[in-house]
C-alpha cells in the first residue's frame, strides 16, 4: 500500500513539474507569430503584438512590431526579403547603440538577433528572454548579453 502511494505521488509530482516547466521545444523564429510562439514555449506570457509607432519606429526600413513577453519589451522587424534584412543589419554598430546615422540611448545594453528576414532587438536584462531569443534566433549580431557576457 505504501509503495502504491509513493508511486502515485511521484507520478503526480512528475506531471506537475512537466506542466509547470514551460520548457517546450523552442522552434526557430522567422516571423512575428513564430517569435511569439518561441517566447510562449519558454513559459512567458505574450501580450498582443502591436505595430511599433513609438520612438523607435524609424530605426529600420519597416516599422516592425512591439511585443511584451512577461513584462519585457521586444522590438521585431520582418523584412520583405533576406537581402533587405541583411542590408538593415549591416547598419547596426557592433555595440548596438548606432543604426546608420542614428544613435540610440538604450536603457540597457541592446541585443540584436537576426534569423532570415527577421531582426529582433531586446533592450533588457532578463536572462530567460535573452536565452530564448538566442535559441530561437541564433547568435547576437550586435550588442552584448546582460552583464557584458
Model-found features: residue ranges?
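Short, solvent-exposed recognition patches
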Residues: 33-105
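A short, solvent-exposed beta-edge/loop patch
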Residues: 100-149
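Hydrophobic helical h-region of N-terminal Sec-dependent signal peptides
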Residues: 10-14
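Bacterial N-terminal signal peptides that target proteins for export
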Residues: 1-6
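Soluble non-cytosolic domains of exported or imported proteins
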Residues: 26-33, 127-131
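C-terminal motif of bacterial Sec signal peptides marking the signal peptidase cleavage site
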Residues: 16-19
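Bacterial signal peptide processing site
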Residues: 21-24
